[in-house]
């Protein structure tokens, strides 16, 4: 049994009848911050709660137990959690609400102090999710921060009615970038058994899922920690041959994005030609301070290999602006790399100091106004390239997975195999599913199209870019 750290609860455990509903099921509500890994973990614990007889509800007001899945990668989601816990504590004092906290922030001293301050009853680190049944039987506050070996063994049931789903294949990270807290919060890399991965995907396929995304902090390292496991390239081929129409993966590391992975993508039609390859900076000096383990030339060589084998590949990246010590010259090197690659999409952030990381301990942060000004320039660069790339799709026919209503009136939204958001008239795609769509118009952020063979819709004014 993993160690736990007991404190007295404000009421007599979780086994009693819900307040005001004698004999009724206990009700839980889950709030998720952060990445797709957190979304997957929330689905995992949600299915676990249902199997234990709990009812999932859509709001804090309906719930007896609110579980907050936290993110610690940047400061903003941490502050959101702090604010939310303050609100939940008031509900706890008013009506005996139980509060749970999980995810990366829960693994850190900062999160544990927050949990004690705001009266959190259950605190589970990312490696202790399978302790939830034990926690729910407790009559004491339950904290578990261990990395349990069985956390990768659980296969959650397919999400009801979902056409796309995530599947975790590896947890943790063996890289130690100076800005990143993930190796601390999620531990070293541990690959999931391939039989469990394939079984989960088969269940998703039987449930009607047509798109699966393989998840990990560094999916490219899959299998390296377990003798006898397939490599990531081999796993891609296995999953790509299962009959799922669309297979994606997140996230990659340039050091581990090897030629055999590129070959597997090129030779397996089911694998989408969307590659997210975080560069973080175009400056070798900054990459060295980040401890990214590669340099600009290596990254560009990987891009060249990808373009050579996959000329239709859609490329996206992550970039951190204003890392400690970044000069204007360093930033110009990032802008020039952006031009050299010509990304379709990018996720850009100003550097956020995270306590417990080497960068936080050893480097002095830049003034916020410098970071924000550089970010604005990079965003303009990104919009310019995204628009240029999106225009290349006008007149082409693409496969779009329509998910549901768009914010724009009269349209439904989906995404193509290159992960572009695509809007089509709602009358042409009345139900979610896969459609062949001819792209008619592009903006920097969206593609607009019409379903091939569908009756021409009444004119709908397209949103202004």
Curated annotation (Swiss-Prot):
It is found in: Cytoplasm. CDD domains: Radical_SAM. GO terms for molecular function: 4 iron, 4 sulfur cluster binding; metal ion binding; N6-isopentenyladenosine methylthiotransferase activity. PROSITE patterns: MTTASE_N, MTTASE_RADICAL, RADICAL_SAM, TRAM. Binds 2 [4Fe-4S] clusters. One cluster is coordinated with 3 cysteines and an exchangeable S-adenosyl-L-methionine. Residues 26-141 form the MTTase N-terminal domain. Its main location: cytoplasm. [4Fe-4S] cluster 1 binds at residues 35, 71, 104. GO terms for cellular component: cytosol. Its cofactor is [4Fe-4S] cluster. The keyword RNA-binding does not apply. Signal peptide: none annotated. It comes from the Bacteria. [4Fe-4S] cluster 2 binds at residues 173, 177, 180. InterPro entries: Elp3/MiaA/NifB-like_rSAM (IPR006638), Methylthiotransferase (IPR005839), Methylthiotransferase_CS (IPR020612), Methylthiotransferase_N (IPR013848), Methylthiotransferase_N_sf (IPR038135), MiaB_methiolase (IPR006463), rSAM (IPR007197), rSAM_horseshoe (IPR023404). Keywords: 4Fe-4S, Cytoplasm, Iron, Iron-sulfur, Metal-binding, S-adenosyl-L-methionine, Transferase, tRNA processing. Residues 391-453 form the TRAM domain. It catalyses: N(6)-dimethylallyladenosine(37) in tRNA + (sulfur carrier)-SH + AH2 + 2 S-adenosyl-L-methionine = 2-methylsulfanyl-N(6)-dimethylallyladenosine(37) in tRNA + (sulfur carrier)-H + 5'-deoxyadenosine + L-methionine + A + S-adenosyl-L-homocysteine + 2 H(+). Pfam families: Radical_SAM, TRAM, UPF0004. Its EC number is 2.8.4.3. Residues 159-388 form the Radical SAM core domain. Catalyzes the methylthiolation of N6-(dimethylallyl)adenosine (i(6)A), leading to the formation of 2-methylthio-N6-(dimethylallyl)adenosine (ms(2)i(6)A) at position 37 in tRNAs that read codons beginning with uridine. Belongs to the methylthiotransferase family. MiaB subfamily. Monomer. NCBIfam families: miaB-methiolase, MiaB/RimO family radical SAM methylthiotransferase. This is tRNA-2-methylthio-N(6)-dimethylallyladenosine synthase. It comes from Thermus thermophilus (strain ATCC BAA-163 / DSM 7039 / HB27).
């Amino acid at each position: 049994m993993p160690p736990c750290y007991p404190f007295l609860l404000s009421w007599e455990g979780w086994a009693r009848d819900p307040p005001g509903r004698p004999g009724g099921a206990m009700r839980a509500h889950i709030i998720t911050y952060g990445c797709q890994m957190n979304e997957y973990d929330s689905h995992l614990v949600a299915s676990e709660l249902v199997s234990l007889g709990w009812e999932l509800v859509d709001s804090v007001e309906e719930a007896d137990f609110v579980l907050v899945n936290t993110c610690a990668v940047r400061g903003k989601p941490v502050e959101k959690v702090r604010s939310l816990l303050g609100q939940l504590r008031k509900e706890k004092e008013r009506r005996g609400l139980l509060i749970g906290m999980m995810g990366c922030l829960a693994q850190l001293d900062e999160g544990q102090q927050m949990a004690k301050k705001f009266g959190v009853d259950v605190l589970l680190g990312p490696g202790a999710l399978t302790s939830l049944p034990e926690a729910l039987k407790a009559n004491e506050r339950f904290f578990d921060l261990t990395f349990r070996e069985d956390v990768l063994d659980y296969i959650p049931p397919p999400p009801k009615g979902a056409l796309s789903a995530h599947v975790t294949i590896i947890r943790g990270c063996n890289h130690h970038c100076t800005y990143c807290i993930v190796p601390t919060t999620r531990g070293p890399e541990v690959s999931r058994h391939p039989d469990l991965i394939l079984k989960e995907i088969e269940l998703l396929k039987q449930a009607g899922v047509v798109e699966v995304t393989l998840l990990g902090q560094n999916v490219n390292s899959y299998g390296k920690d377990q003798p006898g496991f397939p490599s990531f390239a081999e796993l891609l081929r296995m999953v790509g041959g299962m009959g799922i129409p669309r297979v994606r993966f997140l996230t990659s590391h340039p050091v581990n994005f090897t030629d055999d992975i590129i070959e597997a993508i090129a030779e397996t039609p089911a694998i989408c030609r969307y590659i997210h390859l975080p560069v973080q900076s175009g400056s070798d000096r900054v990459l060295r301070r980040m401890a990214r383990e590669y340099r600009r030339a290596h990254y560009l060589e990987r891009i060249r290999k990808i373009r050579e084998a996959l000329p239709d590949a859609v490329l996206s990246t992550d970039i951190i602006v204003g890392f400690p010590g970044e000069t204007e010259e360093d930033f110009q090197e990032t802008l020039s790399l952006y031009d050299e690659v010509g990304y379709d999409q990018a996720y850009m952030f100003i550097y956020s100091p995270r306590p417990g990381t080497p960068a936080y301990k050893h480097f002095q942060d830049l003034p916020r106004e410098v970071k924000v000004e550089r970010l604005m320039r990079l965003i303009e660069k990104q919009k310019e390239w995204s628009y240029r790339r999106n225009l290349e799709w006008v007149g082409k026919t693409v496969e779009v997975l329509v998910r549901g209503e768009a914010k724009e009136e009269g349209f439904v939204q989906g995404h193509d195999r290159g992960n572009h958001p695509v809007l089509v008239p709602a009358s042409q795609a009345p139900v979610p599913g896969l459609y062949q769509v001819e792209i008619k118009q592009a903006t920097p952020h969206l593609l607009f199209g019409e379903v091939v063979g569908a009756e021409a819709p009444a004119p709908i004014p397209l949103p202004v870019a």
